[in-house]
């Protein structure tokens, strides 16, 4: 592997498999049992106008990347550093070949991203959401728990938990009817527990806080 610690330390956990052509740039923390495939780039600076490494021309340092235990990052995946919060890939996530995780995006546990899916900056994805191949999200989007996004969809607004959406722009098609979701095909907010909506509300609160900080940084 190629390691760049110019702007921060690279920490690799136990029992990881990292191909020699992968590029790891700090600040970066990788948990245990993580797979990083050929030509993956993890920790590159944010794609945003401004100075390296922060990307907004401010004195604030990059917030880095956290890859949690058991994540699988396939060949040619890109994961960029956060600017105001760490970019996070959660436990047991599967990022298929060519997926792009933009700066400040955060993925919960068990998220699946199809090949060549692209997240806009600051995207938040809750646990066990699934992206088909070629999905694109608008910056600042929130994807709820166990949501299903159909292939080649363009997601321009938040997706509620357990929803199934597809299209360009993506539209609600019903519930995620996969066996592990255990919902009827017709989507209704009343089907979901209070705890699911509480999780979704916490994501929204986190996003509003980040938007306030971002506005301050961008005009300071």
Q: Where are these predicted regions, by residue range?
A:
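Amphipathic alpha-helical blocks and their helix-capping loop/short-beta junctions
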Residues: 168, 176-187
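Intrinsically disordered, low-complexity terminal regions
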Residues: 183-220
């Amino acid at each position: 592997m190629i390691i760049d610690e110019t702007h921060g330390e690279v920490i690799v956990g136990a029992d990881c498999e990292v191909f020699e052509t992968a590029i790891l740039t700090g600040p970066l923390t990788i948990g245990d049992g993580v797979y990083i495939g050929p030509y993956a780039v993890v920790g590159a600076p944010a794609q945003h106008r401004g100075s390296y490494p922060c990307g907004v021309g401010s004195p604030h340092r990059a917030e880095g990347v956290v890859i949690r235990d058991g994540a699988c990052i396939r060949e040619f995946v890109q994961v960029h550093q956060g600017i105001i919060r760490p970019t996070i890939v959660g436990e047991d996530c599967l990022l298929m070949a060519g997926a792009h995780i933009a700066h400040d995006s955060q993925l919960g546990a068990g998220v699946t991203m199809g090949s060549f899916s692209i997240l806009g900056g600051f995207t938040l994805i809750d646990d066990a959401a699934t992206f088909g191949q070629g999905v694109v999200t608008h910056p600042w989007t929130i994807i709820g728990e166990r949501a299903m996004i159909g292939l080649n969809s363009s997601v321009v607004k938040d997706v509620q938990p357990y929803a199934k959406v597809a299209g360009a722009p993506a539209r609600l098609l019903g519930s995620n009817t996969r066996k592990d979701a255990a919902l009827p095909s017709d989507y209704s907010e009343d089907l979901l527990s209070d705890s699911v909506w509480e999780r979704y509300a916490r994501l929204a609160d986190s996003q509003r806080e980040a938007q306030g900080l971002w506005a301050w940084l961008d005009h300071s």
